[in-house]
């Protein structure tokens, strides 16, 4: 029987941070849970980051993933918005790392290519393929669906990552 690897995908955002947890056993994928951590827009930035940290910490503590996949930040024209997203992303990287969970990062185009077969696609296509690959998946937001897509992407690439790591260790 294949070892089960639990993967959490995290789609960082300052207002909404999506998360999705799947189990991978051999080639079998199983939906575990998904949701969204929200921060209060009325609060200052530091308080909002604390809210995201607390929420993600609870999720990681509850589901105890073995590996994490986090989306790379895209740079947009609004430097302030990009910086704030980067701060939320730092929390998304920090929380699993604090739980001794290796963190892997994926560009949005790589996630789309892995899940729907092309690097550019509508959110609806991604959500549809998440449901095809994880028929029991339930998600409360686009962010949670995107987080499940991140976890799926990592499940497809982790064998290659593992082989690359083992090859480096053999040198």
Swiss-Prot record:
Residues reported to bind Mg(2+) 1: 11, 143
Gene3D superfamilies: Ribonuclease H-like superfamily/Ribonuclease H (3.30.420.10)
Keywords, sorted A to Z: Cytoplasm, DNA damage, DNA recombination, DNA repair, DNA-binding, Endonuclease, Hydrolase, Magnesium, Metal-binding, Nuclease
Cofactor: Mg(2+)
InterPro entries xrefs: RNaseH-like_sf (IPR012337), RNaseH_sf (IPR036397), X-over_junc_endoDNase_Mg_BS (IPR020563), X-over_junc_endoDNase_RuvC (IPR002176)
Residues binding Mg(2+) 2: 71
Active site: 11, 71, 143
Main enzyme class: hydrolase
UniProt remark on cofactor binding: Binds 2 Mg(2+) ion per subunit.
GO terms classed as biological process: DNA recombination; DNA repair
Record-level GO cellular component terms: cytoplasm; Holliday junction resolvase complex
EC number: 3.1.21.10
Organism superkingdom: Bacteria
Reaction equations catalysed: Endonucleolytic cleavage at a junction such as a reciprocal single-stranded crossover between two homologous DNA duplexes (Holliday junction)
Compartmental location: Cytoplasm
Recorded GO MF terms: crossover junction DNA endonuclease activity; DNA binding; magnesium ion binding
Pfam families associated with the record: RuvC
PANTHER family, sorted: CROSSOVER JUNCTION ENDODEOXYRIBONUCLEASE RUVC
Functional summary from the UniProt entry: The RuvA-RuvB-RuvC complex processes Holliday junction (HJ) DNA during genetic recombination and DNA repair. Endonuclease that resolves HJ intermediates. Cleaves cruciform DNA by making single-stranded nicks across the HJ at symmetrical positions within the homologous arms, yielding a 5'-phosphate and a 3'-hydroxyl group; requires a central core of homology in the junction. The consensus cleavage sequence is 5'-(A/T)TT(C/G)-3'. Cleavage occurs on the 3'-side of the TT dinucleotide at the point of strand exchange.
Family: Belongs to the RuvC family.
Subunit structure: Homodimer which binds Holliday junction (HJ) DNA. The HJ becomes 2-fold symmetrical on binding to RuvC with unstacked arms; it has a different conformation from HJ DNA in complex with RuvA. In the full resolvosome a probable DNA-RuvA(4)-RuvB(12)-RuvC(2) complex forms which resolves the HJ.
Protein's recorded name: Crossover junction endodeoxyribonuclease RuvC
Taxonomic classification: Bacteria, Pseudomonadati, Pseudomonadota, Alphaproteobacteria, Hyphomicrobiales
Gene from which the chain derives: ruvC
